[in-house]
Amino acid sequence: MPKVGVEQSLTAISEELRGMGYDVVQLKQEQDAQGCDCCVITGQDQNVMGIQNAVTQGAVINASGLTAEEVCQQVDQRLRQQ
């Protein structure tokens, strides 16, 4: 199953993705994003973690303003495109 990194504060999204069968990893620092097929961030510190500096080869989804369901749909779509 694809590995999805999710920022710590996005608990509802983590739980929903786990329910969909994804391997969810909590993003606490830059290295946590390595090996992830997709990362979900809050958008508050969009590049503080360095995720958009090509730490991960996967998609980066900004969860700002989206519901957990909307974010999970985006994760699903992006991972199917890869």
Curated annotation (Swiss-Prot):
Q: Which domain of life is it from?
A: Bacteria
Q: Which InterPro entries match?
A: UPF0180
Entry's family note: Belongs to the UPF0180 family.
Please state what the protein is called: UPF0180 protein BH2667
Which species is listed as the source? Halalkalibacterium halodurans (strain ATCC BAA-125 / DSM 18197 / FERM 7344 / JCM 9153 / C-125) (Bacillus halodurans)
